C-alpha cells in the first residue's frame, strides 16, 4: 500500500470550509490517526505554508502531527528540476506570473510533485485542486501530474480508498 502526500489545502480548506476544528472533531481525530499510522504525510514546504499563520490550524498541527510527518524535499532536486523544465517549456501557454508563482521556492506545489515523482508507484498527491489545462494564469497541480504520471486525488477519496469513516 502506498502513502498519501497531502497539500496544504487539505488542511486549510478542511479547517476553513468543511470540517472546522471547533466542530468536526471526528475528522481531525481521523487525520491524526492516519498521520500517526504513516498513511498520510506531507512535505516541508507544506509545513512552511501552514506554520506561518499563528492560528488554530497551526496549533492543531503542532500538537497532533508526528514529528516526522513533514518530509524533507532536499533529496528530490533532480525531480524538481524536471518539473521546472516542464513549467518553463510551457511559457507559450502560461503567463510569466503563473510560472513564477508555481516555481517560487516558498511554494509547495512543484515540490509536492517532485516528491511524488521519486516513487510514483506508491505516492499519491492529495489536493483539492481541479484540472484546468486551459487556464493561463495559474498552474494547477493536476496538469504536471498528468505529464509525470503522478497520481492525485481529492481529500475525501483518501478516506474512501482506505475505507475509513469519521
Per-segment meaning from a language model:
Residues 1-3, 14, 20, 35, ...:
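Feature 3881 marks metal-assisted phosphotransfer/nuclease machinery
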Residues 5-6, 41-43, 125-127, 153-154:
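A structural signal for short, well-ordered beta-strand segments and their strand-loop junctions
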Residues 8-121, 131:
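Active-site-proximal, substrate-binding regions of enzyme catalytic domains
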Residues 121-124, 130-166:
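Acidic, PIN/NYN-like endoribonuclease modules and their adjacent C-terminal/linker elements
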